[in-house]
């Protein structure tokens, strides 16, 4: 299914023209809904602390989670106490739920589990982001709210908007759902504070982000990084992210011999039997996001690659300046 959609959205499949009338309808609905909030006919919830939205205008993963982790570390370094809210995709959550390092992905979603495991950040997940934000402020000592996704959740007022764009795929065929990958028109990118480009090449006015591999970690936590597979070794690779080929290309660039690769749909659930059969006796390499979903049954030779986002110093300075301005405005 995912490969067919990729052909439609990114490879110029002619079927996109048949779906164009539905895209026009989708565009009209989303525009009308946005205008209801813009003119005040539908209320927006505001909060006494800055709200930063990390989202995108395309369907699928683009690098939001590494960006959220980058923001957490940047803001903490400068004395802020951020917290994160998220939808918790792929799991059914009644109301809202605080996320702790002991939670697994089946309880809170894969991205929240990964973010909290890496940073131990205060975090609340739930379908209603307003309720999640309120519980975050009620239960934790937080002075900035970061929303992992939620760019189109206009009921939540925001102070800073960041769009993460896949630098290789960019806007695909430029069409809205279902003919293309866009949730909103490309014009939306011009209305946000920053467009962050993951990979590829940033265009004028965009911020270039690089995902830098750091260290191999044992998925089950029982093995030392010193025993991780070495380059030139035969391995099996898997990825259930928005753009799996990016991970496979990274491994090839690092020198690993990919005996087999398996792309799964984003937010896929994994079973021990499926992954054991996939790997056989070879080391199984995966992303950090995949690892949080199989650490309970992982074998000793399963590894995940941690990556750190790198952004220009100028972006850091601009963001911190804007955060300071918002804090001062809210204190008046």
Curated annotation (Swiss-Prot):
GO molecular function: ATP binding; tetraacyldisaccharide 4'-kinase activity
InterPro entries, alphabetized: LpxK, P-loop_NTPase
EC number: 2.7.1.130
Name of the top EC class for this enzyme: transferase
GO BP annotation list: lipid A biosynthetic process; lipopolysaccharide core region biosynthetic process
GO CC annotations on file: plasma membrane
Binding site for ATP: 58-65
Pathway(s) the chain acts in: Glycolipid biosynthesis; lipid IV(A) biosynthesis; lipid IV(A) from (3R)-3-hydroxytetradecanoyl-[acyl-carrier-protein] and UDP-N-acetyl-alpha-D-glucosamine: step 6/6
Record bears the keyword Lipid biosynthesis: yes
Record's catalysed reaction(s): a lipid A disaccharide + ATP = a lipid IVA + ADP + H(+)
Keywords (A to Z) from UniProt: ATP-binding, Kinase, Lipid A biosynthesis, Lipid biosynthesis, Lipid metabolism, Nucleotide-binding, Transferase
Purpose: Transfers the gamma-phosphate of ATP to the 4'-position of a tetraacyldisaccharide 1-phosphate intermediate (termed DS-1-P) to form tetraacyldisaccharide 1,4'-bis-phosphate (lipid IVA).
Family of the protein in this entry: Belongs to the LpxK family.
Protein name as annotated: Tetraacyldisaccharide 4'-kinase
Organism, scientific name: Shewanella piezotolerans (strain WP3 / JCM 13877)
């Amino acid at each position: 299914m995912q490969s067919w959609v990729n052909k439609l959205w990114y490879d110029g499949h002619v079927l996109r023209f048949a779906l164009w009338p539905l895209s026009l309808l989708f565009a009209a609905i989303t525009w009308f809904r946005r205008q209801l909030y813009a003119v005040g006919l539908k209320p927006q919830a505001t909060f006494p602390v800055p709200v930063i939205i990390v989202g995108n205008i395309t369907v699928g993963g683009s690098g939001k989670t590494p960006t959220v982790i980058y923001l957490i570390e940047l803001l903490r370094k400068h004395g802020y106490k951020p917290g994160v809210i998220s939808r918790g995709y792929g799991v059914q959550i009644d109301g809202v739920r605080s996320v702790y390092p002991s939670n697994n992905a089946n309880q809170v979603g894969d991205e929240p589990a990964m973010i909290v495991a890496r940073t131990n950040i205060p975090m609340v997940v739930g379908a209603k982001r307003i309720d999640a934000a309120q519980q975050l402020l009620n239960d934790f000592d937080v002075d900035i709210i970061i929303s992992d996704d939620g760019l189109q959740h206009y009921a939540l007022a925001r102070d800073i908007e960041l769009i993460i764009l896949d630098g290789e795929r960019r806007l695909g065929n430029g069409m809205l759902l279902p003919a293309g990958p866009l949730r909103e028109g490309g014009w939306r990118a011009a209305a946000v504070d920053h467009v962050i480009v993951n990979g590829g090449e940033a265009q004028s006015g965009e911020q270039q982000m690089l995902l830098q591999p750091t260290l191999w970690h044992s998925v089950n936590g029982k093995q030392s990084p010193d025993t991780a597979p070495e380059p030139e070794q035969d391995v099996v690779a898997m990825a259930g992210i928005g753009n799996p080929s990016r991970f496979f290309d990274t491994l090839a660039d690092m020198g690993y011999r990919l005996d087999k690769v398996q792309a799964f749909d984003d937010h896929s659930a994994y079973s021990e039997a499926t992954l054991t059969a996939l790997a056989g006796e070879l080391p199984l390499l995966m992303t950090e996001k995949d690892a949080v979903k199989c650490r309970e049954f992982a074998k000793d030779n399963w590894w995940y690659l941690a990556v750190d986002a790198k952004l220009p110093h100028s972006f850091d300075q601009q963001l911190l300046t804007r955060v300071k301005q918002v804090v001062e405005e809210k204190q008046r």
